[in-house]
């Protein structure tokens, strides 16, 4: 449960950057052009790389999880023979499809429906902002309830959110409501999904097995 909550906190903090970047990008591109904007984003990326270098891996004595004697190949073989793991990989493909669809096409979609470009930027910012709360709640609930139920509910509500947005008359209010609702569900799948992988196979190869799930994203 602690691991699931920790994953939700990391996801939530990552969403804070997603909240800020559309606002900054929209302003910077208009005022200073793409060269300056790209330079600033490069500096931010370098900062992240430097921070990652100092991340400390836990020693064996600090680990509270029991690990198996499985080899890398054995763990991979077991995973792909497990129906639940295949379903997770497939589900995360749908998750990535949702996110890419919204991130790529919604900004142009709202402009085509007569709204301004700042509205598109606001939608993406709201997605990042509300994903902070969605990820934290998902992590908390995943530690208390069935993770597969949490995951199923998130995917179902995402579909409802997209359908309502498409068939609702275009306005800033409907756009902002969509950004908030979809943002709440944006990456709230991560804590539940990583928790299920850890529950199925333990933590020894969690990074690799969850990485494969995320690859399908």
Predicted regions and their residues:
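Intracellular juxtamembrane helix-capping segments at the cytosolic ends
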Residues: 1, 7, 188-201
